[in-house]
A protein has these predicted regions:
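Conserved S-adenosyl-L-methionine
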Residues: 96-104
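Short, glycine-/aromatic-enriched active-site segment of Class I SAM-dependent methyltransferases
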Residues: 180-197
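Glycine-rich SAM-binding Motif I of class I
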Residues: 91-92, 113
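Flexible, glycine-/basic-rich loop-and-beta segments that form/coincide
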Residues: 234-272
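A basic, amphipathic helix-loop patch mediating RNA/tRNA/ribosome contacts
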Residues: 1-48, 82-83
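A short glycine-rich, Lys/Arg-flanked "PGG" loop and its adjoining helix->strand segment in the class I
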Residues: 158-175
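S-adenosyl-L-methionine
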Residues: 106-159
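Conserved class I S-adenosyl-L-methionine
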Residues: 79-89
């Protein structure tokens, strides 16, 4: 099965429109199986290795595209706010926050030396590397957090929400990447750490909703990430609002979102 290169870029989150995809291809930064391809209509195998080299996606990493989608579908903006990027890595989410008006971003990650140099040297960024979010307390910060994102691996959201509850403003909002491979029981995770069953995705999202509500967050929106994980995992974006009276998502929304995700992404190639 083959697919047009520009269509592939759109489906996998490299570009937000066909025109943007064509521009990337024509600029000479798109490589298929290590070979530069400059024709948007080039037909490629669905399992081909596709790379967009350079920062022409607009952010230091493709992670920024996940937050970009969240801001398109949920009523959340970082303009003028103190923000936190939990699981910052190279800083795609941080970059997206700054691009959209954040006044300060605390970039938190257990790793070291990963944050892009352009962000490391930006006076609006507080680089909290070598920091486990589970150990962060309000007195470690100079501010309350009004806008946050979560993109972490090998840790469940049940460990994130209790901390967010203590460091956020009363009206804070956030978007959490729900990764089934790190939430589901081991018996439900397949080869290479991939969760494929819609029933497991549904179960995980109900669990994530419970974690949020138990820590004073209302799950106020849900969608699927435009980018699959490296091994092909479908991941989800959950929009939350800090609240003393948390409410669940509308009935049936979790099931519908899972169905929409599988319809859109089951045949999409994995991200490389």
């Amino acid at each position: 099965m083959k697919i047009r290169l520009d269509q592939y870029l759109c489906q996998n989150g490299y570009a937000q429109s066909r025109e943007r995809a064509k521009a990337l291809i024509m600029s000479g930064i798109v490589f298929v199986n290590e070979q530069k391809v400059d024709k948007a209509g080039e037909m490629i195998a669905e399992d081909a290795k596709v790379e967009v080299r350079g920062h022409d996606i607009g952010y230091v990493s493709r992670g920024g595209l996940k937050l970009e989608k969240a801001m398109q579908v949920f009523p959340m903006r970082p303009d003028g706010k103190v923000c936190m990027d939990i699981g910052a890595s190279t800083g795609g989410f941080t970059d997206c926050m700054l691009t959209n008006g954040a006044v300060k971003v605390y970039a938190v990650d257990v790793g070291y030396g990963q944050l892009a140099w352009s962000l490391r040297t930006d006076e609006r960024v507080v680089n909290m590397e070598r920091t486990n979010i589970r150990n962060v307390t309000p007195d470690m910060l100079g501010d309350k957090i009004a806008f946050f994102s979560v993109d972490v691996s090998f840790i469940s959201l049940k460990h994130i929400f209790p901390v967010a509850d203590t460091i956020c403003t009363p009206d804070a909002v956030g978007v959490c990447l729900v990764k089934p491979q790190f939430e589901a029981g081991r018996e439900k995770v397949g080869k290479k750490g991939v969760v494929r069953e819609p029933a497991t995705h549904t179960e995980v999202l109900h669990m994530a909703q419970g974690y949020a509500m138990a820590n004073h967050f209302t799950p106020a929106g849900l969608d699927f990430s435009p980018i699959k994980g490296p091994e092909g995992n479908i991941e989800f974006l959950m929009y939350v609002q800090h609240s003393q009276n948390p409410q669940p998502l509308p009935e049936g929304l979790i099931e519908q979102t899972v169905a929409n995700a599988h319809a859109a992404l089951d045949k999409a190639p994995n991200l490389h």
